[in-house]
Amino acid sequence: MQLTELIETTVTGLGYELVDLERTGRGMVCVYIDQPAGITIDDCEKVTRQLQHVLTVENIDYERLEVSSPGLDRPLKKLADFTRFAGSEAVITLKKPLDGRKTYRGILHAPNGETIGLEFERKKGEAAMLDFTLADVDKARLIPHVDFRSRKQ
């Protein structure tokens, strides 16, 4: 079983989604998890303990394991991510330029089959729609919006 498959099986078995996995040349394994309610430190600790056990049993060589949430600017990698975050602002970088550009910033639209939509501003005040598939995407990330001025009552 490959490392990605092993980690994904473990993470999903605990009720979380594997968002991303990075392995550095220095033996560090970084695992990014999520769930609809968000991720807490306790969630990261629970997954870390289970992964440490699994990696030891499977004799996977690693120096350090980090488990964390994907953050506010989480990557979008699966079609389900684009469905979940429809209506959110995102930046999409395409593998090949379209109309002379590769990077687009706008509002995600829910996928229609395999086609994903991004409403962006072509010129000042002129909205346009970019239709693309996962195969067209090099990178996609949410754009975080944090309001430090609002207060809970």
Swiss-Prot record:
UniProt keyword annotations, A-Z: Cytoplasm, Ribosome biogenesis
Listed Gene3D superfamilies: Ribosome maturation factor RimP, C-terminal domain (2.30.30.180), RimP-like superfamily, N-terminal (3.30.300.70)
Cellular component per GO, a single term: cytosol
One GO BP: translation
Principal localisation: cytoplasm
PANTHER family: RIBOSOME MATURATION FACTOR RIMP
NCBIfam families the UniProt entry points to: PRK00092.2-1 (NF000929)
Function description: Required for maturation of 30S ribosomal subunits.
Descriptive protein name: Ribosome maturation factor RimP
Highest classification ranks of the organism: Bacteria, Pseudomonadati, Pseudomonadota, Betaproteobacteria, Burkholderiales
